[in-house]
């Protein structure tokens, strides 16, 4: 089971981020060697293992997760990294199968054609029998296995000293192995975009961006498919190594197969402040249309997402972290397939995800963490409600 671990290391704004160097930071435990082996083991109390709105089932969960990582410079200009991580979860009180197996395989290839031109390709495959994000409103069943793959590509170049261009693409495939869930939710999400930035000041870059997205469900009805065009502008601000901010605002024009098209605003805002060594605070806000877990009754979900992350180095060996993610949303109703003359009304749904963690690092190759995570969903449809707490203790050893 993958807990939030209290700290959200990434954000929905990642696609807007300024291109990073080819040699992205390698975790401290993996520096200085090409091949790294590690083992994580932990125990967690989960108050609602199926994410049920009522009659929640709780259980102790025991986890073991070995990992093999490779970080290698193939040439002076080419870097390759990959890892494979299988995970075994055992549930004391889970109906049906008590032992679940998951695995993740990630790979990255980065090449610098010159000091101003880089290509970065990543692929992430996941097979998860115990997914972190359970499906609101889905009938409770013992199989929510999700298989997914995400491919990302970025080509960054600078025609002039002040002008930068980025070509980007992302393709994601979601495959629920349960036939009932798969018929509703299996899909491809493909995103393509071009971004340009101009260095107005040493610490300020103006940015403009166009994106196109296709969401194609693998099963009928085809009216679940949609196609979007985004146009946005904003800036990236970096006042030295400690303070940074990014803003994108614009609009999305979405066309549906079988429904009327719509135009909505789009916004992304984030900021980060490193106030001490090993300590920072970051926060952000996004507004967007997203896919729902019930495409039969709802076409989209209008989501306001606000998040705050804090990491504080208590001592050289102890790190505390906390995060909160609040998402007030509106599920947009659609005509019912059984009777198109009837339209499902819009539904308000608020989600809160919060966590805290304390991590002890006695040596460079050993960490011990205790964490608490809380998930709350309050929906206008009672069957979509969720209340879940998880308390975990884990340890990781790097060999």
Question: What is each stretch, according to the model?
Answer:
Residues 1-27:
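Cleavable N-terminal export/targeting peptides
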Residues 20-399:
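Gram-negative and organellar
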